Amino acid sequence: MFKPGPLYNKRYHIMERLRKVSLETGDVFYNGSNVRGPLGIPFGGLIQLFTKSIYSHATVTLVEEGEYYAIDVSDYGCRKLRIIDWFDNWGVEDFCVVRLKEKKTDDEERFKVAIKKFLDEDPDYDFTFNNPDAYYCTESVKRIYGELGYDLGGSYLIKDIVPRWFYPILQIGSLVTKITSGASLPTNVEISIVGNERKGMLASPLMRKIIAYDGKEFTYFS
């Protein structure tokens, strides 16, 4: 049964604001998330907590014939959704949109080629965050940008993200579940995080914010 999220009744108003800034193919949404990772751990919430950020999810925008689409990778899989529909069941309200500071003349088309290639592959969602044949949200954004030669950074080992006191707890839990179920946390693989303006993809010097929403007010950036 469909359960609308907090943005459902605001979606038309939000779309008006997004059209005001004229979204472009390649723009990236950063928003909060309650997605769960391996072991059922509320990975999105923990990442937001440990990185002191309200964002943990990332999605690339595609513009086709005036319509805005989200190329979203989540536990629902890899999907191309109209952004107005994508808002329907968000569990949170906060988001911002970032854009390349300096775009090359052919970047728009190159983004479209990279996005089409990614959609055609239709990769699975990476529930373990360390499957080389699957993707999670921020990883998909970095993959698409990487196709154009842009490195958004923001990749770290888990031990460099979580507090020192919490890391041993994760290691013990990971070892136990690896023995019992084969699932484990990616302790030896860097994961990509949205983070904040000091650490993470949001700190990339290649990008700039164009709009942000906190659930009540919009902020525009020049």
Regions from the language model: what does each represent?
Residues 1-222:
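Cysteine-nucleophile amide-bond enzymes
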